[in-house]
Every structure is written in C-alpha cells, then in structure tokens.
C-alpha cells in the first residue's frame, strides 16, 4: 500500500480556528551589491504595494483501504479574504473568513487549526518553513459506504513541520518570487534550474483510540493504529519558467522532483483492542520516497495594479497520505 505525504506552502502566515489569519513575509538578506538584469526584471522593492486577496489553506490525509483505494479526510476550514501590504521585502496580510460561501459547514463538523508558514524569498535562494496543527476531520458526503451524509471526527489530529531550501541558478534573469509577493515583475520570459534540500516531519494521531472508527468499511487496520509518524529528508532538483505575453500578462510554473529518505512508524492507539505498550505496531521502516514540489502563478501586472493567482503543492509518496494545499488570488 502506497501512502502519499503532500505539503503545500504559501507565504508567512498564521491562522487560528475559523476567525482568519495574519500573514507575514520576510525576504532573505541579500549580499551587496546585488546586480540583476534590468532587461528581464523590474523591482518595486522601495514602493509600498497594497493588495486585496482571497485564499484557502487546508491539510488533508488519506488512508489506504482494503480494496486498494484511498479514503480522503479533510478539515472543515474556510475561504478567507483580506488585505495586505509589502514594502522593502516585508509583507503583512490580514485575513478573515468569508461568510456565505462555505456551504454545509455545520454538517462537516468542527475543525481548529494553527497554520504558520514562513517564506523567505531572496534573489539567489528561498527558504520555506512550515508549522501546522489541525484537529477535526470529515469524509465527504456519500464517500463512506452505507453512510449518506458527512462523516466527521473531531478527535483526529495532524501535525507537520519542516523546511525547503531552494537555490535559483539563473537568478539574474529569472524572478522566483514575483508571482507570490507582488513587489517584482518579470519583464521578459526566462527560466532557471532550481535545486536544494527538503526536510519534513508529519504525524497523524488520535489520542484514545485508532485513527479510523471500527465501523468504517475497508479501514479495519486503522481502527487500531493510533499514530502514524513520518520523516522525509533528501535533495530536490527541478526547473522554473515565467512566460510573459502581451507585455503585461504572465504564466509561471516551477516543479522540483526529489527522492527522499523516508522513515515511518505506526503505533497502536491507547483504546484499541489488546494495546501493546512500547514497540510500534509495524516497527520503523525506511525506504526511498519520490517527492514533488509544484508552484503555479498567473495574472496581469501594470505599473500601478495587478491581478494574480498563486498555488503551491508539495507531495511525498510513501506508505500513507498527508497533504497540504494553498491556493489564492490577489488583486
């Protein structure tokens, strides 16, 4: 059975419950002088930029079923809207939940979360740091055999933390950050080789019993497994390209592939039948886990305003599945 662990990162942000979140971005210190090709990149570093945005961040996980499929668990978090500012590489966003567009929210149960992400966009290098705590998950309507409504469990918890370092080889002509921070513009199409290192820890747990309720068809194994721990570490390499057309419109994409060393453990829940203290249910296993980090950006920029869409997704493949996604639009 194959498990995926996916991680998605936005900018520096903290969110708590469904009241919204504050978001901060910091830029890596750049050695002076930093000389980039002004025929390819325009910088608005010393101008105050303001934006209005809509975004959604969520962490999901799936468990493999007895028939070889996967059962998807999602938190009940919301779309958010807010306003943000950037000046000299420092950004702050203030957001809150959007009323009226998160239908069936009460049927999906209650979720709480603390989602902190810090993204430091330097000219030559970037660093992404993650710290996420989610509690309360549901299975989609009609997805559970013999159950027509939403199945929710407010006791399931997910924890992730880690970081990604990326070096930008063609930093003089390729802007890695312009789609995310709005303080820079790619004037001509350009790309770059990207490479670096990934470290990620993830935990899925339920304190007093197995992660899956015994009544969930196809997940009998996980009615006893109360903790799933995973470490992933390894190098990544890829390519990013920004395509500029009609002078002001752009599409950007960056993909990094990796083969990480994956260490994972499964432990019985405290309330499972015949709990075994001490050793993990399956011991500690190690394998090589493929990984992918993808970023997409699209939009329009003028000298005074712009509209942008930005999406980031980070995926690891091993023996279970955890995933975080970030998507948003900026005006």
Per-segment meaning from a language model:
Residues 24, 34-46, 124, 170-191, ...:
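Short loop/turn motifs that connect adjacent beta-strands in outer-membrane beta-barrel proteins
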Residues 44-50, 79, 88-90, 123-127, ...:
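Outer-envelope beta-barrel architecture signal
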Residues 48, 79-83, 112-116, 159-163, ...:
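Hydrophobic, lipid-facing positions within transmembrane beta-strands of outer-membrane proteins
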Residues 52, 81-87, 116-120, 163-169, ...:
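Residues on the lipid-exposed face of transmembrane beta-strands in outer-membrane beta-barrel proteins
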Residues 54-60, 87-91, 96-102, 122-124, ...:
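Transmembrane beta-strands of outer-membrane beta-barrel pores
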Residues 57-80, 91-109:
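Surface-exposed strand-loop-strand hairpins of Gram-negative outer-membrane beta-barrel proteins
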Residues 59-70, 124, 252-331:
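Outer membrane beta-barrel transmembrane domains
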Residues 72, 138-144, 148-162, 203-214, ...:
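Extracellular/periplasm-exposed beta-strand and loop segments of Gram-negative cell-envelope proteins
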């Amino acid at each position: 059975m194959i498990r995926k662990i996916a991680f998605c990162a936005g900018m520096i942000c903290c969110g708590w419950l469904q009241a919204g979140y504050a978001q901060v971005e910091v830029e890596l210190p750049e050695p002076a002088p930093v000389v980039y090709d002004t025929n390819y990149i325009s910088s608005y570093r010393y101008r105050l930029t303001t934006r209005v945005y809509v975004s959604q961040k969520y962490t999901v996980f799936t468990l493999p079923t007895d028939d070889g499929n996967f059962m998807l668990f999602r938190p009940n978090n919301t779309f958010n809207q807010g306003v943000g500012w950037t000046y000299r590489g420092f950004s702050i966003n203030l957001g809150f939940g959007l009323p009226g567009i998160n239908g069936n929210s009460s049927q999906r149960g209650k979720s709480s979360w603390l989602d902190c992400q810090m993204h430091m966009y330097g000219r030559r290098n970037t660093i992404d740091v993650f710290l996420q705590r989610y509690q309360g998950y549901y299975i989609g309507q009609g997805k559970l055999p013999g159950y027509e409504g939403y199945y929710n469990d407010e006791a399931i918890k997910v924890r992730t933390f880690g970081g990604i370092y990326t070096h930008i080889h063609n930093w003089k002509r390729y802007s890695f950050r312009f789609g995310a921070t709005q303080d820079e513009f790619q004037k001509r199409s350009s790309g770059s080789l990207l490479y670096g290192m990934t470290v990620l820890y993830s935990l899925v747990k339920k304190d007093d019993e197995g992660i899956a309720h015994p009544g969930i068809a196809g997940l009998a194994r996980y009615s006893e497994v109360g903790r799933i721990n995973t470490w992933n570490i390894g190098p990544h390499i890829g390519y990013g390209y920004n395509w500029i057309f009609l002078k002001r419109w752009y599409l950007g994409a960056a993909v990094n592939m990796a083969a990480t060393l994956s260490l994972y453990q499964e432990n019985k829940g405290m309330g499972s039948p015949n709990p075994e203290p001490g050793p993990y249910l399956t011991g500690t296993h190690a394998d090589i886990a493929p990984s992918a980090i993808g970023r997409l950006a699209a939009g329009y920029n003028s000298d005074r305003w712009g509209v942008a869409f930005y999406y980031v997704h980070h995926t690891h493949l091993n023996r279970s599945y955890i995933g975080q996604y970030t998507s948003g639009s900026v005006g």
